[in-house]
């Protein structure tokens, strides 16, 4: 029988430059999701600090916030995808920062690290963070997925590059309310054009002078909305068989050719 994956959309108000507050809120979300039998919980971009250009907020992959998130995942036996600003060494041995999406296994160990490929020059992100060079495809309970971060959403070629290899795309973001209509449209478009599930998790609240109003959502491979209403932590089920059925009936991806 084809495996399915229950994913929780962990939207919350991130504490600005306040990992203690942020991690406490994240724990509430994760524990609530576990009660709903979620196997994967998705948290927003930079989920411990908010979207910040303060290099001092970044931490190494073995830093305290990451250790806390790993322990949290292990304590409730869920996998956890969380956005963190990380500090690491470049191949040349220099210190560099990345806006990352990190997948923790249900044993608390880091399973995958995706680095945001398109940094947001409009906000000065390009002056602080080094862009990632490649997509990351991983598997959670037999379901193939690729994580992306916020501004990546505006570049459809990034998603098309992995479409045939995944069942789901997961987007984590700090997407301001002022551009919410773009978020709503682009998230759904990525599901329709790539014929796969899309799970997109945004934050709420205030941070860095900006207002965030959530809008976390999930769509099936036909672009139909899946996000339940009236629950604090919504969950959706990813079914690879549905992806195959849509692609077999409407084999649009077979006709794809890269532009000359």
Report residues per predicted region.
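CN hydrolase (nitrilase-like) catalytic-core segments centered on the catalytic cysteine
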Residues: 64-81, 153-235
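Cys-nucleophile CN-hydrolase/nitrilase-fold catalytic domain and related Cys-dependent amidase chemistry
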Residues: 19-20, 24-107, 113, 176-196
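Short beta-strand scaffold segments in enzyme catalytic cores
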Residues: 82-84, 99-103, 136, 216-218, ...
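Short, basic/aromatic-enriched C-terminal tail that caps enzymatic domains
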Residues: 235-260
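Extreme N-terminal starter segment of soluble prokaryotic enzymes
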Residues: 2-8
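Active-site catalytic loop in hydrolytic enzyme cores
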Residues: 90-164, 178-185, 245, 249-252
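Short polar catalytic/cofactor-binding loops
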Residues: 11-16
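Structural motif
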Residues: 39-40, 145, 168
């Amino acid at each position: 029988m084809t495996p399915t994956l229950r994913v929780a959309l962990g939207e919350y108000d991130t504490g600005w430059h306040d990992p203690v507050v942020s991690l406490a809120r994240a724990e509430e979300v994760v524990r609530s999701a576990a009660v709903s039998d979620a196997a994967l919980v998705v948290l927003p971009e930079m989920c411990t600090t908010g979207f910040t250009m303060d290099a001092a907020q970044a931490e190494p992959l073995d830093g305290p916030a990451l250790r806390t998130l790993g322990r949290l995942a292990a304590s409730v036996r869920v996998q956890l995808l969380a956005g963190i600003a990380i500090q690491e060494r470049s191949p040349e041995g220099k210190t560099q920062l990345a806006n990352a999406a990190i997948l923790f296994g249900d044993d608390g160990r880091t399973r995958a690290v995706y680095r945001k490929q398109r940094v947001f020059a409009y906000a000065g992100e390009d002056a602080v963070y080094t862009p990632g060079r490649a997509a990351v495809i991983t598997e959670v309970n037999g379901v193939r997925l690729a994580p992306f971060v916020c501004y990546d959403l505006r570049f459809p070629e990034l998603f098309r590059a992995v479409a045939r290899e995944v069942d789901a795309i997961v987007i984590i973001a700090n997407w301001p309310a002022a551009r919410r209509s773009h978020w709503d449209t682009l998230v759904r478009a990525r599901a329709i054009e790539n014929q796969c599930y899309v799970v997109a998790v945004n934050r709420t609240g205030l941070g860095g002078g900006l207002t965030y109003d959530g809008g976390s959502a999930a769509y099936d491979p036909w672009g139909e909305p899946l996000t339940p209403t009236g629950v604090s932590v919504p969950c959706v089920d990813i079914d690879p068989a549905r992806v195959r059925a849509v692609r077999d009936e409407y084999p649009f991806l077979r006709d794809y050719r890269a532009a000359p």
